Amino acid sequence: MAEFVRAEVLGTKFEYTTRYVNPQPIGMGSFGLVCSAFDQITQQPVALKKIMKPFDSSSLAKRTYREIRLLKYLRHENLICMRDIFISPLEDIYIATELLGTDLGRLLSIKPLDSKFSQYFIYQILRGLKYIHSANVIHRDLKPTNILINENCDLKICDFGLARLQEPQMTGYVATRYYRAPEIMLTWQRYGVQVDVWSAGCILAEMLRGKPLFPGKDHVHQFHLITNILGNPPDAVIEKITSKNTVNFVKSLPSREPRDLSTVVPKDTDFDAIDLLKKMLVIDPDTRISAQDALRHPYLAPYHDPTDEPVASGPFDWSFDSADFPKETSKIMIYSEVLDYLNVDNPADPAPFDPSTPFDPSALEREFSEFLSDSGQT
């Protein structure tokens, strides 16, 4: 049986196995605390995420179970990789993942990114999304703080707690407001993987601009900001809205023509970057570009390699997600997943992403290392 050490971090009890030493707080969210620590077995730094009181409610237990299942199934260079999982004596769950130095949100809050980094990062985001979507998974909460980056320019998408199957009925409140797709705000009962592409488009715009494109103060203000730039929703979109009140709201909006997106980014922005942005930020999701097609866009030609943009081995099994389990049943299911992970030889971490297309990754890494140093992130 594993031995545990108990410490107090930011006023929170933090219990971890003796495999790990020197926990240091790096983040706190509504569902738990994240600390950096050193793994004495692998001799590598890790991020230890504490999920607090996962068995207190059926909804939290299901969210926890879903995240564990997804982390076990999704294996890709541009997705965060689970290294270990354990349940503490106080019945909190701890998930160890690889540790990356910073996140995109933190970087963007300090200084604008050089265009070459924006290009490389959106490529990796879309590469990860292509894989996620091929598994019939929608991330639903893509935002800069869920994009982790290290000093080698390696990028990984994290936080799959809100991820869902693409299905006929979907809940409306997902994604941080600035990055929320219009079909979610328009209370559609069905939406798909295109919501992640919209979020990625918002992230690309923010990298190019150095500030959010749609910084809405509330739900209504958010939609006004979108229509101020992209124009009124087309009839094809309005016809899919199921709420009469929402239809009335959309029809009451003043008539607005779409603006040229070149007016919302710096004057020296690459034409191809603007063109990709136009294809990602389309109000009608049925005509919005897919992650797979976006990878083929000329803007990403320096990195695009169809032989090294893998898809999942098959769709993720979502059969559990439609059922409502009692808390005790969910608890047994979570314990079973943890034991399964610990008792099965887990595949090695995906190799670091290294495009075979003709560019010099070492030069980009050196420049990014200097950028991080100048930003105080190293």
Curated annotation (Swiss-Prot):
Pfam families in UniProt: Pkinase
Catalytic activity field: L-seryl-[protein] + ATP = O-phospho-L-seryl-[protein] + ADP + H(+); L-threonyl-[protein] + ATP = O-phospho-L-threonyl-[protein] + ADP + H(+)
PROSITE patterns documented for this protein: MAPK (PS01351), PROTEIN_KINASE_ATP (PS00107), PROTEIN_KINASE_DOM (PS50011), PROTEIN_KINASE_ST (PS00108)
Ways its activity is controlled: Activated by threonine and tyrosine phosphorylation.
Active site: 141
Domain of life: Eukaryota
Entry keyword annotation includes Transport: no
Boundaries of every Protein kinase domain copy: 20-300
Entry keywords, A to Z: ATP-binding, Kinase, Magnesium, Nucleotide-binding, Nucleus, Serine/threonine-protein kinase, Transferase
GO terms for MF: ATP binding; MAP kinase activity; protein serine kinase activity
GO cellular component terms, A-Z: nucleus
Residues given in the record as ATP binding sites: 26-34, 49
Required cofactor(s): Mg(2+)
Disruption phenotype: Increases the sensitivity to osmotic and oxidative stresses as well as to cell wall damaging agents when sakA is also deleted. Affects virulence when sakA is also deleted. The double sakA/mpkC deletion also abolishes mpkA phosphorylation.
Its EC number(s): 2.7.11.24
InterPro entries (UniProt xref): Kinase-like_dom_sf, MAP_kinase, MAP_kinase_CS, Prot_kinase_dom, Protein_kinase_ATP_BS, Ser/Thr_kinase_AS
Presence of the UniProt keyword Kinase in the record: yes
Family named by the database record: Belongs to the protein kinase superfamily. Ser/Thr protein kinase family. MAP kinase subfamily.
Entry function: Mitogen-activated protein kinase (MAPK), part of the high-osmolarity glycerol (HOG) pathway. With sakA, plays a role in the osmotic and oxidative stress responses. Involved in paradoxical growth, the cell wall integrity (CWI) pathway and biofilm formation. SakA and mpkC collaborate during virulence and mpkC could act by modulating sakA activity upon exposure to several types of stresses and during cell wall biosynthesis.
UniProt protein name: Mitogen-activated protein kinase mpkC
Annotated source species: Aspergillus fumigatus (strain CBS 144.89 / FGSC A1163 / CEA10)
